Amino acid sequence: MSTNNTTTNNEDLISSLYPPPPPYYKFFTKDNLQKLSTWQENNQTTTVSSEVKLEEENTDPDSNNSEENSIPPGELRFLIPPKQPEGPQYRGYGNIWLFEDKLPNLKDSQWEQLYNTSTSTFTSTSTSTANTNIITNTDTDINGNQEVDAGDSTGDENLTSETKIKELHKLMDSLLLNFLELIGILSIDPIKYDKKIHDINLILININHLLNTYRPHQSRESLIMLLKNQIDYKFLEIDQINKKCLDIKSKIKNLINERITVVSDGTTTNTTTTTKTTGLGDGDSIDEKEQLKQDIINRLLSSI
């Protein structure tokens, strides 16, 4: 019984590795495709005739009837591809995705914005007063900074690097102060810790949101580094290929020079005797050259 249970469990695991195909794949047959083509031809003729009648009667066509006429009946409707989703977002794989790839602001995420998005208000007095508010009272820092440009949806895109650094420093100071206040509350009245935990959570979310604004810059820099590494690797491969080519050329030259010297030493002593005794002509010299080439190739292959 135990072996049967293990085999059934293994079969379930194997069958659950990949999801089964959708059931409407069975409708994609040649007969249904032919029926769909005939239906589309008939539907085009009927729609043209109905539009002509509506123009003659000066009546507006009903949108519901037109949508119903554009959908084939029965199982043929599964052969028509679905329409593109309308609106700013769509659902896929259990999540909601935006068509426009941008970082949502904190207001859209139902969180309070603590940092200031206006770049014109960053003077020495404003930063000093903000820092004093952080040190004296953290609650006024959270509520006070939240009121400034909290509803600006495009402020995050217009933030400069200097502004982000200043706001991150202020948020870090506020985070440290809230942590110290939380320790003091826990030592005096631990029941009142909830409000400080909420403030720390809110500050951390704002810090995380500001850091996420650096994601496009990080992706560009990482892409540049990847391309530079690929270019360096290609140059290294080219250098190695050139070195191998030069090495092979030098080996070929050395083999040719060695063979020529050996042949020249042997032929100079025996040229007169071979021509007198055998009477060989130009054909024999051609055979010697071919043999020389073959010997050089063989030695080259053996050396490689």
Curated annotation (Swiss-Prot):
Q: Indicate where this protein is primarily found.
A: nucleus
Nucleus as UniProt keyword: yes
Which InterPro entries does the entry mention? Med7/Med21-like, Mediatior_Med7, Mediatior_Med7_sf
UniProt feature coiled coil, ranges: none
Which is a GO BP term held by this UniProt record? positive regulation of transcription elongation by RNA polymerase II
Which superkingdom does the taxonomy of this entry point to?
Eukaryota
GO MF terms listed in the record are: transcription coactivator activity
Asked if Ribosomal protein is a keyword of the record, the answer is no
Subunit architecture: Component of the Mediator complex.
Q: What is this protein called?
A: Mediator of RNA polymerase II transcription subunit 7
Q: Which organism is it from?
A: Candida albicans (strain SC5314 / ATCC MYA-2876) (Yeast)
Lineage summary: Eukaryota, Fungi, Dikarya, Ascomycota, Saccharomycotina
